[in-house]
Amino acid sequence: KQLEGMTFRQVLNLGIVPEGVEREYNNKNYKGGMGTLIEERFFGYKANNEQEADFQEAGVELKASPLNMKKDGDYSVGERLVLTMIPFDKPINDDFYSSHVWKKSEKILLVYYERDHELDRYDQTIKYVKIITPSSEDLKIIKEDYRKIATIIKAGKAEDLSESLTSYLGACTKGADGEDAARQYYPPHTRAKKRAFCFKRSYMDYVLHERIMARTKRRIPSLRIQRSSTR
């Protein structure tokens, strides 16, 4: 909660630098995400690209994501929430709860900041910070989405994946304009665009208003869901 109301520049000014980190954030050459900045310069952990959660002891994954302010003054999420790459080059786990995507999504420390294109990226203000876990109702849909994605991959048809096939958990393209391709583990071993598991933007908009901003009577467009109890 200490982060709420701070700008990224104020985070940098705290002077926290983990041992062995030489990244220079406060310049135009830094192309990384703001989540890495928070992990290293607020929590003091050296960022890594491992499949485990960012804070392994607590099993918590850190994600920083932008918010857009609409004309009516309400917020909407600025983008989907990318979780982890989909491994096309090896077998996909049939059990959702044993998968890397569950390790990355079981507990997420969400840091939402207001995106203002008139301000420098380091002067964006952090609005909300909260740990979220998918509710039991959400997990029913997420697990079914995972099953659909895994079934297509195991059929050797990863090139047919599309975010439109699922409800909450998506398979978004990665790489330069989705052009990077990888050979599939499953026959006929054709190449497919690299993709990552993500929580779709519509689902994250629901999470923002129902779990973080605690608003009521809001639903994901075109989806029928039951409101979950507070967890």
Provide a role label for each language-model segment.
Residues K1-F55, E61-R231:
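Nucleic-acid endonuclease domains
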